[in-house]
Amino acid sequence: MTQPPTRLDPLNSPFPVPWNWVMATLDECPTVTSPLLRYYRSPSLVSPDGQYAAYSRIQMRIQPDFTRSQVASVLFLENLRTGALQVITASSPFADNPFVPRPSATPLGTIAIIIPIAWSEQGDRILSREFESLFGTAVASDYAVVWEQRRNQTYTIAPTQVDYSNAVLLGWSGSYPDQVLFQTGHLGEEERSRWAVDVAGRTIAADPEDQPVVFGELVNNIWTGPQAHG
C-alpha cells in the first residue's frame, strides 16, 4: 500500500489526519468576526479488488475564539462500478455528519476527523481512523471505525478495560484479521502498550510479534485537498 507523504499529526500516527490544513486554516483567519466554513477532501483509498473507493470530507467551522471552532467529517464509500455512494459515520463521542442539516448537540471546540486507512485483504471490510480532540486542550485519541460489507454494518471501537489518555490506531492485526491494533499511553509518559481489539470491543494484550497490516491503494485526484469555500 502506498503511504502518503509525512505530515504533521497530533498523535504522531502512521496515518496522519490533515492537521497541517487545520492549523493553516486557523492562521489564515486570525481575526474572523463571524463563523467561516472551510472544506477538505482526503485521498481515495481503493479496495484491493478495485470495486470500492473510500474518502472523507471534512468541514471546519472557524469561530472568532478558535477554541470554539469545530472540525467534523464523514466517510463516503463509492461503488466504482455503479457510482453509488454510501455514508459512514462513527458513533464516537464527538462524531457528527456536518453535511446533514439538523440541530447538533455536539459541543463547541470539538475535532472529529475520520479518514480511511486500510481495506481488508479480501476487500470486504474497511478500517478508518476517527481522531477526536478538543481545541485548546491536551485531549486527543483515536477510535477505529470498521465497515463490514456482508452485513452492511459499522462498528466504532477503542480499547476497553484499559487505563490510558491517548490511543493511536495502528491498522489491522497481522495475526488475527478480525481484530485491529492500538497503541495506548498517558500524556507525558514514554511507556506504551499495544492492544488487539475486536468489533465487540473485547481487548487483549497484543502478541509482541503481531504487526499491523494495511491493504488498498491511496489515489489522489483533482478534488483531493482543500476545496472551494462553502
Regions found by a protein language model. Give the residues of each.
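Sequence signature of WD/YWTD-type beta-propeller architectures
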Residues: 1-230
